[in-house]
Amino acid sequence: MCIRDSAKPSSKVTTPSTAAIAALKKLNIKKISIFTPYPQKLNNQVVSFFKDEKFQVTSNSYLDIDSDSDIWKVDPDFLYEVLTNMDHGDADAVFISCTALPVLQIIQKLEKNLNKFVLSSNQVLIWDTLEKIGQNNSISGFGKLFNSN
């Protein structure tokens, strides 16, 4: 028996991974481009996870950073340039993995530039949490996902 089930069986739970899947399904996205700050091995696990969930990964790029304490120091302007110049193929959306990566403030700008949905770990966590507790999750300034209701 799962500890959560014995403690609070009706608990609503989300993770960055499950929230990303929920958001991609809500938006009817099938093809994604994935960006991570992780080392290659962990990056490849992220890609495999989405492939196992039946998403077509059109492209992938990663920064090869080992430590969360270094990931949060990545400059958002640098991220914007990297993501703008990344070949996303014919992806319908870009998923940016990692809750430590400072990407929330550039999502809307990226969506406008790339003309694609841009989803990040923190963004989908916020969206899915609000969705699960039945709160209005229409929030401006953090991407088109929040306008999908």
Locate predicted features:
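Short, small-residue-biased leader/transition segments that mark boundaries at the very start
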Residues: 1-3
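Conserved beta-alpha
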Residues: 6-66, 146-147
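A polyampholytic, Gly/Pro-enriched intrinsically disordered region
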Residues: 30-41, 77-87, 136-149
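Short hydrophobic/aromatic-enriched beta-strand-loop microsegments
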Residues: 33-34, 54-60, 114-122, 137-141
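Active-site rim beta-loop-alpha module in soluble metabolic enzymes
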Residues: 41-97
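Short, flexible loop segments at boundaries between secondary-structure elements
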Residues: 65-68, 116-138
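Catalytic alpha/beta core domains of metabolic enzymes, predominantly
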Residues: 79-80, 98-104, 114, 120-121
